[in-house]
C-alpha cells in the first residue's frame, strides 16, 4: 500500500467536534477500502493568506494515511462533495513521520515561550497577560 500525507481545510464556522466527526467519517472511508490512518493532527483554526469561498480562517487537519490509491480517491471524492471542506492536498511520501509535524512542534514551542514569559494565548491567537487575581 502507498503512504500519503493529507491536509484539509474545513470552514471556520464548523466546530471542533464537527471536524472530529469529519475525521472519523474519512477514517471510516479509508478503513472500509482496506487502508488505515496512522496519525491525525488537528492544527487548529488559522488565518488564510487569502479568502477561500468567503472564509478568512479555517480548521487545518493533517492525516497520515497508509492505503491503496482507490481508498484515497474515494475519500477525495467525498471531500469534493462536502461544502464544509474548503481545500485539501494529498502528497505521496516514501515514509510517514512518527514524530509530531513541524506545525505541531511550532505550536508547542510558541506555547512554551508564552508560559516562560507568563503569558497565555486564547483560541484566536491573542496573547495577553495572565490574570493572577482569579
Curated annotation (Swiss-Prot):
GO biological process: translation
Keyword Ribonucleoprotein: yes
Keyword annotations of the record: Ribonucleoprotein, Ribosomal protein, RNA-binding, rRNA-binding
Positions of region (Disordered): 99-134
NCBIfam families membership: S6
Family stated for the protein in its record: Belongs to the bacterial ribosomal protein bS6 family.
Function text: Binds together with bS18 to 16S ribosomal RNA.
Protein name in UniProt: Small ribosomal subunit protein bS6
Organism whose genome encodes this protein: Methylobacterium sp. (strain 4-46)
Amino acid at each position: 500500500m502507498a503512504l500519503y500525507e493529507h491536509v484539509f481545510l474545513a470552514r471556520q464556522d464548523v466546530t471542533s467536534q464537527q471536524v472530529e466527526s469529519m475525521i472519523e467519517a474519512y477514517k471510516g472511508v479509508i478503513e472500509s477500502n482496506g487502508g488505515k490512518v496512522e496519525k491525525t493532527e488537528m492544527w487548529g483554526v488559522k488565518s488564510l493568506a487569502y479568502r477561500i469561498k468567503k472564509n478568512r480562517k479555517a480548521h487545518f487537519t493533517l492525516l497520515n494515511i497508509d492505503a491503496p490509491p482507490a481508498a484515497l480517491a474515494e475519500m477525495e471524492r467525498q471531500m469534493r462533495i462536502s461544502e464544509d471542506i474548503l481545500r485539501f492536498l494529498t502528497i505521496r511520501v516514501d515514509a510517514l513521520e512518527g514524530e509530531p509535524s513541524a506545525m505541531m512542534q511550532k505550536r508547542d514551542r510558541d506555547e512554551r515561550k508564552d508560559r516562560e514569559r507568563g503569558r497565555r494565548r486564547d483560541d484566536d491567537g491573542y496573547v495577553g497577560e495572565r490574570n493572577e487575581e482569579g
